[in-house]
Amino acid sequence: MSEQEIRKILEDNNQYLLLKHLDNLSEDKRSILIANLKKLDISSFFNIVKGTKDQKKFQYSEIKPAEVLENSKVDESLFRSYGEKALKNGEVAFFMVAGGQGSRLGFEHPKGMFPISPVCSKTLFQMHCEKIHASGKYYGFTPRLFIMTSSSNHDETVKFFNENGRDWLNLNDIYFFKQRDLPAIDMNGNLILIGETSLFTAPDGHGGALLALKENNMTSIMHKLGIKYLSYFQVDNPLVKLADPVFLGLHIFNNADISSKVLAKRDASEKVGVAAIADGKPCIIEYSDLPYELAIKKDDDGKLLFNYGSIAIHIFSVDFIDRITTDALHLPYHIAKKKIPYFSPDTGYLINPETPNGIKFEQFIFDSIPLANKTVFYETLRDDEFAPLKNKEGDDSIKTCKDGISLFYKNWFKRAEIKFDDFERATVEVSSLFAIEYEQFK
């Protein structure tokens, strides 16, 4: 694509400020910025922008709660046998989404490097990898881990694993790849500069994971290794139960394309997407898209009608990922208004705004659910599997995450009727290398 064609795209999309900036640059710097614009495929990006403008925020004519398999009503022994067989046959791999930085924690490194275990200060990466290692040893299979990073943390993540990861897993069984970046716009629709010759970019959301798997040939690797099922989780939830044979067995028994764990919401305002049936299809509706009157509505028993929230724990059939990414995966884009640092050509300085000044474009992984032929929603319990690390303080903070880990293991001690001095105030941690399930622990 020539410079003239780039300029035409910018002009057609009212990018007059950027065109003016291009004209004011030296020839060398202008060439660099043009090259960066080419790499970002801005023509496709503007189609994304137009597509989000055309979308209605809530576009369903009929919506009702999804059918959820409740934890207490599932025949675990039946489904466990299916899951254990798949694990022992090496048909399961693990997919960790780890593209985030720890900035909101006051930690300027990949979030997975944050030390979070309450006693030993193990990092998120180590906690997850030790679970995976222990699962492989327990079920007798070679554990494979696929890690999606971002351009902002890829190199540091790979370096961290090269220096530490061989203590947890065989590095030859870890596959790293980056998700795609997209530009952002300000509130007036102008592309945002991060430097004199470069645009601000950000990852395209966890929904970009499926296409990233395909584009980076990860699904081809999975097929060669005989992997049929992918256990998806996000790096910032250290309580996620990896290699869960019951959940996996439910997925296999039901011949599902996608299975998702959900839990009862704390209250109507909790910021999690809800499991629903919209226009006849299972889906997760993002909390910000669910009308308020539906969010607070209760059933005859006094429970929230839309009671079950998604916690980003899924199982995908690899064949399903292949099927929906054969040509191109057209998941909807969602806008997120954020504080975005920007370069000012007028002053020559990088400015950090105090209030949201721009719009990022993101895809959500759960928007692939309506494309599935069969979906399973399975209830898990908050204390068992959800202690996300999002913030330095407040909800989903360092403290609440550490407390959640400690409570999880203290419950093991209680079930085993093991007590010690000052038990209630004690901080407890059990290594996954010792036990990954209570049955092993006791």
List the model feature ranges, each with a label.
Residues G99, S150-S151, Q179-R180, E215-N216, ...:
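Fold-independent oxyanion-binding glycine-rich loops
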Residues R166, L171-L263, S269-E270:
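Conserved beta-loop-beta/alpha segment of the NTase-like Rossmann-fold superfamily
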Residues E3-Y175, P183, I192-L210, T219-S220, ...:
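N-terminal glycine-rich phosphate-binding loop and ensuing alpha1 helix
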Residues I6-R7, S81-E84, N217-I221, F247, ...:
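Generic recognition of flexible, low-complexity loop/linker segments
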Residues G226-S231, L239-A243, L248-F423:
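Catalytic core of tubulin tyrosine ligase-like
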